[in-house]
A protein has these predicted regions:
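Phosphate-binding core of ATP-grasp and ATP-grasp-like enzymes
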Residues: 172-175, 181-217, 231-247, 251-258, ...
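Conserved beta-strand segments of alpha/beta enzyme cores
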Residues: 31-33, 75, 101-104, 244
Length: 338
């Protein structure tokens, strides 16, 4: 029997729904449960075939534990190694190189540093920042936001250089980006499951986050051509990042979908927040993806240590016995021909 574990934070409806869905569709061959962990031994055996991670970005112990589980062959949704290395500024740069429309973005040095960092530690930094050059490239309005974060935290809309200085001076130790503000005609948020299934949701970011009012029910919101492009851009991004579950947000201006946020490996899927249809869609599609991949096999991440854990001689020793019957058959045929 295969086992799926769910690692959760404060959410309630999504974990319950995905557990019930997997247990129902798994038909006794696959079961799902909430994970319970304590002190993890370095030789901890495999306990789950798949773990759905919803909280390790906020709990370092969970992230370290998931990396250890991955070493035993547990498939983590989403990959804890890449999630640890990932950041939004890199994502913007990568997406632009693979043909996705991205608003102009600049990475800014931090305003403050930990106490052990002195001016001597920062001799490679230009000072002061060429603010005029930054603003000339980005323009206004713009958004000042963390290079690594989510949930619309610490995001400010900027309309002038003076406002930029004021907000930047309050950013503390956060590493920030300044991004061109797209005065959009339409806005969509998209679920992507398994790097292939996409749900495009009309979305109003001006409404309170997690309020349940952001998802707008508008029929035929995008033209068929625009719908196809958005869907393809979502798949392109998620394939490049390797995320099995993600959301991608687009600000659409003059028919061009600009991807403004797509590092969401634990996207909101609460019933009260996203609505019944969207909640059910992500639960059903994630369930189907997991069950299918447990039968077919997940794509294996190629880590540098993989070959060391499975060296060629070890693989050959497993296959070697199969050669003996063939040798006997050959000898018997040769003897018969005499």
């Amino acid at each position: 029997m295969k086992k799926v574990g769910i690692l959760v934070g404060r959410e309630h409806s999504f974990p319950e729904s995905i557990i019930n869905s997997i247990n129902e569709k798994g038909a006794g061959k696959v079961t799902a449960e909430m994970i319970t962990v304590g002190g993890i031994r370095m030789d901890e055996p495999k306990r789950w075939d798949v773990i759905i991670d919803r909280i390790s970005h906020e709990v370092p112990y969970y992230r370290a534990m998931l990396k250890r589980m991955a070493l035993e062959g547990t498939h983590i949704i989403n990959n804890p190694f890449w999630w640890s290395a990932d950041d939004k500024f890199f994502n913007f740069s990568l997406a632009a190189k693979i043909g996705v429309a991205i608003p102009k973005t600049v990475l800014l040095p931090q305003h403050e540093y930990i106490k052990d960092i002195t001016s001597e530690s920062l001799r490679n930094l230009e000072f002061p920042i060429d603010w005029e050059g930054v603003v000339s490239y980005i323009g206004f309005p713009a958004f000042l936001k963390p290079h690594d974060g989510g949930g619309w935290k610490n995001v400010s809309k900027i309309h002038s250089l003076e406002e930029l200085w004021s907000e930047y001076n309050q950013s503390g130790k956060l590493c920030m980006t300044l991004q061109e503000g797209i005065e959009y005609d339409q806005f969509v948020r998209c679920y992507c499951v398994g790097k292939e299934k996409v749900l495009i949701m009309p979305y109003d970011p001006s409404k309170p986050y997690l309020s349940g009012m952001q998802y707008v029910d508008v029929e035929s919101y995008l033209s068929p051509e625009l719908h196809k492009r958005v869907e393809q851009d979502v798949i392109t991004i998620c394939k490049a990042l390797g995320y099995d579950l993600n959301t991608v947000e687009f600000a659409i201006k003059d028919g061009i979908p600009y991807a403004i946020d797509f590092m969401n490996p634990a996207p909101d899927a609460e019933l009260a927040s996203v609505g019944e249809y969207n909640h059910r869609w992500v639960v059903d599609n994630l369930t189907n993806f997991i069950l299918r991949k447990l039968e077919e096999g997940f794509d294996t991440a190629d880590y540098r240590w993989t070959a060391m854990l499975n060296p060629p001689e070890k693989q050959a020793s497993v296959k070697a016995p199969a050669a003996k019957p063939a040798a006997k058959t050959a000898r018997s045929k040769k003897a018969a021909s005499k």
